[in-house]
A protein has these predicted regions:
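The feature captures the LRR N-terminal capping module
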Residues: 1-53, 57-112, 118-121, 131, ...
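ATP-binding glycine-rich loop module of kinase domains
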Residues: 216-252
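Structural motif at the C-terminus of the N-lobe alphaC helix and the adjacent alphaC-beta4 loop
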Residues: 251-260
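Short beta-strand micro-motifs within the conserved protein kinase catalytic domain, predominantly
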Residues: 264-277
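Activation segment signature within eukaryotic-like protein kinase domains
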Residues: 319-320
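Catalytic-loop of the protein kinase fold
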Residues: 327, 331-347
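Conserved protein kinase catalytic/activation segment
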Residues: 344-356
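C-lobe/activation-segment region of protein kinase-like
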Residues: 354, 359-410
Length: 437
């Protein structure tokens, strides 16, 4: 984090990224002295409600973060920034998004947790748009012009007021990761699964160290008494995340049920002193690790893999089969995961894998309707992306014939005609038919 003192003293000349979070109520004009080099400007966590009309005087500005401020309108000056491609205004009080605020190279727009009820039609005139984060607003519909955004891969529209998912949305050729929980359109969760989940008293848990923390909650190690069984406890936060509501995530975890490639839910915590929602889950063996890291600002919708990550055909096939199997399982239960990515998969050296993080999960009808099929085939594209990433990293055992089969499957999963893609059951059957040597 940089300081205002450094900025005003001229000590930041030549920097490409500036991070200022110090209670700012107005944009420091000294930022313009960095115009020759500044590419990423992070002004999140201040008290700003406007930006200067001449923001375009930062000609190299590519990324602007202004989350957790006091904006009521997306500033129109953004549209004049020729190179600006990523805009983040999460958790403001934005009600109005003028068309003038949309820069021509817009690729990634974050408007999570605001008060937006309408988006401009001109949003569909941004052909590079790839990632659109709109969870936690007041949207009852989306601009039909978004049908023109053929590069749009990730949409978060959870916790809005949508009564239907438009046909054009489900036909977008590149759409891969969709989250729409907490809208009137979403099917009700499987109450039977919810009822069958045991209640575990808070008093029966001895909490230990923190194992991890994400946007939706904190995971802690614990001992479950009276048997002192080691478990993991996920304590859910109440606020809206980029994916949607943490409580919807909890509901999806319960409804997902049992599968070898899911982390088992032991029960729901009751009697927390602050009434905090929590689940008790199996403790994962330390031999498991994340398959990939989150996308970067540059990669946008693609995970980052360690350069040294390599697999044998047997290990890659075992992971691909596991994820296809759990995908089919979830779809049979009327659940789309919404965030099927390497960074949400834990794996070990044998190729055993677990799909986690249900923050973007949504419920759909289990009947075989065109809408259900489209929702499921959108997720199959995510599997196709993952399969391609695994294929790139196989270093042992891959014959030309097997490569052709896997590349053919990957192409079918990612083809632009959504309903022509295979379902997960067909994908799983094909993967099972491939010899491992």
């Amino acid at each position: 984090m940089n300081t205002l003192v450094q900025l005003k003293a001229g000590q930041l000349a030549g920097i490409q990224r500036l991070d200022l979070s110090c209670g700012l109520t107005e944009f420091p004009r000294e930022i313009f002295e960095l115009a020759d080099s500044l590419e990423i400007l992070n002004l999140s966590g201040n008290a700003l409600s406007s930006l200067p009309d001449d923001l375009h005087r930062l000609p190299h500005l590519r990324v602007l973060f202004c989350s957790d401020n006091a904006f009521t309108e997306l500033p129109a000056c953004l549209g004049q920034c020729a190179k600006l491609s990523m805009i983040g205004f999460k958790a403001n009080r934005i009600r109005h998004v003028p068309a003038a605020a949309l820069p021509p190279l817009l690729r990634w727009l974050i408007l999570t947790d605001n008060c937006i009820s309408q988006l401009p039609d001109e949003l569909g005139e941004r052909p590079l748009l790839q990632k659109l984060m709109l969870a936690g607003n007041h949207l009852a519909h989306l601009p039909p012009s978004l049908a023109n955004c053929h590069n749009l891969e990730l949409i978060r529209i959870a916790s809005n007021r949508l009564t239907g998912l438009p046909d054009w949305l489900l036909a977008l050729p590149s759409l891969t990761w969709l989250a729409y929980a907490g809208n009137p359109v979403e099917m009700a969760a499987d109450v039977a699964a919810d009822d069958a989940t045991p209640d575990i008293p808070w008093s029966a848990l001895e909490l230990a160290e923190v194992l991890g923390e994400g946007a939706s909650g904190v995971i802690r190690k614990a001992l479950w008494q009276p048997s002192a069984k080691p478990v993991a406890v996920k304590l859910y936060k109440g606020s809206i995340t980029s994916d949607g509501s943490p409580l919807h995530e909890m509901q999806a975890c319960i409804a997902a049920g049992l599968h070898p490639n899911l982390i088992k839910v032991e029960g729901r915590v009751v009697g927390h002193p602050d009434d905090q929602a929590a689940l008790v889950m199996d403790l994962i063996e330390p031999s498991y690790r994340n398959l990939a890291a989150l996308p970067s600002l540059a990669s946008c919708t693609r995970d980052i893999y360690e350069p040294a990550t390599r697999f044998s055909l047997a290990v890659a096939l075992r992971m691909a089969r596991g994820i296809a199997s759990v995908g089919a399982h979830l779809h049979r239960h009327g659940i789309t995961h919404g965030d099927l990515y390497g960074h949400n998969i834990l794996w070990n050296a044998a190729g055993d894998c677990l799909l986690g993080d249900f923050g973007a999960a949504s419920f759909h009808a289990t009947a075989d309707t065109v809408e259900t099929r489209a929702l499921q085939r959108i997720e199959v594209r995510a599997f196709g992306v993952l399969l391609g990433e695994l294929l790139q990293r196989i270093d042992v055992g891959l014959s030309d014939t097997t490569r052709q089969i896997l590349e053919g499957l990957q192409a079918r999963c990612c083809q632009p005609e959504v309903l022509a893609r295979p379902g997960f059951e067909e994908v799983e059957a094909l993967l099972q038919s491939i010899p491992q040597h």
